[in-house]
Design a protein with these regions (language model features):
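Short, highly charged, low-complexity non-transmembrane loops/tails of multi-pass membrane proteins
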Residues: 176, 333-354
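N-terminal signal-anchor module of multipass membrane proteins
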Residues: 1-75, 323
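Structural signal for the N-terminal portions of transmembrane helices
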Residues: 137-158, 300-322
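Transmembrane helical segments that form the transport core of multi-pass membrane transport proteins
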Residues: 193-253
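Membrane-interface helix-loop-helix junctions at boundaries between adjacent transmembrane segments
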Residues: 81-180
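Membrane-helix interface "capping/anchor" motifs
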Residues: 58-70, 88, 103-117, 225-234, ...
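Membrane-water interface at loop-to-transmembrane-helix junctions
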Residues: 176-200
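Structural signature of hydrophobic alpha-helical transmembrane segments
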Residues: 33-50, 80-97, 148-154, 205-213, ...
Length: 354
């Protein structure tokens, strides 16, 4: 007789283990920011925490090799993104380049490993952090540009150096390549939408937090037609619930240090809920997390929250419209009997990239 399958662990035990791991990851993610903040005394370097998340996701989704390339590319791209955001045309062109890169990575199944690169660079293009005692953004300040590149490199390289050792015994899912019939529409959709939005936001100075709209588009658009509508609805619901939390924080908390600590707590909860089947729970927790981390004042927390709610709704509408067009085109191809086109030698080379 075959041995009986082991009974699943109780839910509280699973959540406790996830919470413990999430706490460790979040606490480690703060270390680069603390070190750089002690050196520079500039709040802008707390973006190292975001860079840490970028490197951590790249390690999980693509392996140490892909993560290393991702961190180096992000560090080099950071000053370019900040300078490019000085004019709408240059900023939109650089965003188009990043989206084309992400679309190409989807052919190899590596788009999830590199997704945060254009998302974080959207912030650098549209709304880079303040620098200096005057709290101004000088996109041509060489010191500022250099330190932001260092910030993204230091924050991103830490998980690349630390976590592969602990993850070596885990069976991580292999990247899933996509045929050109799926990766090409995906590339076109994200490039057209994000490029157009970037130009619009840079041309309209009132849209200081328009990077939320770009991140909404990039997160919601899927390769193929799997789960787009469901994920869009859950993201909107979760973000609106997170907005309620942000509104309460604005009324009760006026210290940026306290807000940062609150952001860490929500970050732990968000990581714990990340692998939950209920995506809206994760979105409700990650919304106040990111807003608390990226706002430079308690007033801006409220403004960021309000604009994010608008951006999510607009982005969701754009994504659903674009998805309807691409899904319809895909079904039309299938009805005509056209088979997917796939670059087999390139896809077979995926392991060499990881």
């Amino acid at each position: 007789m075959s041995a009986a399958a082991p009974a699943p662990k109780p839910l509280y035990e699973q959540l406790g283990r996830r919470a413990a791991i999430s706490t460790i990851v979040v606490l480690i993610s703060v270390i680069p920011s603390v070190v750089l903040l002690a050196i520079t005394k500039e709040p802008a370097v707390t973006w190292a925490t975001g860079a840490f998340i970028l490197g951590f996701v790249a390690v999980l989704m693509g392996g140490a090799g892909v993560a290393t390339y991702t961190v180096f590319i992000t560090a080099i791209a950071t000053p370019v993104a900040i300078v490019a955001g000085g004019t709408p045309i240059a900023g939109a062109a650089f965003m188009a380049l990043l989206c084309l890169m992400l679309g190409r990575m989807s052919h190899y199944g590596l788009h999830r490993a590199t997704l945060l690169v254009p998302i974080f660079m959207a912030w650098m293009i549209i709304s880079p952090p303040f620098w200096g005692a005057d709290k101004v953004v000088d996109r041509t300040d060489s010191t500022f540009l250099l330190w932001m590149a260092i910030t993204f490199f230091v924050g991103g390289i830490v998980p690349v150096l630390v976590f592969p050792h602990f993850l070596r015994k885990m069976r991580m899912p292999a990247p899933k390549p996509h045929p050109r019939s799926e990766s090409a529409p995906y590339t076109i959709v994200i490039t057209v939408l994000c490029t157009g939005v970037t130009y619009w936001v840079l041309a309209d100075t009132k849209q200081y937090a328009g990077a939320w709209l770009i991140s909404t588009i990039l997160v919601l658009v899927q390769v193929g037609d799997v789960g787009t509508v469901s994920k869009t609805i859950q993201r909107v619901v979760g973000t609106l619930l997170g907005m309620v939390v942000v509104s309460i924080l604005v009324l009760q908390v006026h210290s940026m240090v306290v807000l940062y600590v609150i952001g860490l707590v929500f970050g732990i909860a968000a990581l714990t809920a990340k692998f939950s089947p209920h995506y809206w729970v994760y979105m409700a927790l990650i919304t106040p997390t990111i807003i608390c981390f990226t706002a430079s004042s308690s007033t801006q927390v409220k403004n960021l929250g309000e604009q994010r709610a608008q951006d999510v709704l607009i982005g969701a509408a754009l994504v659903l419209l674009a998805s309807a067009i691409t899904i319809g085109y895909s079904h039309l191809q299938k009805a005509r009997g056209e088979s997917p086109t796939q670059d087999l030698p390139a896809v077979a080379g995926v392991p060499t990239l990881a």
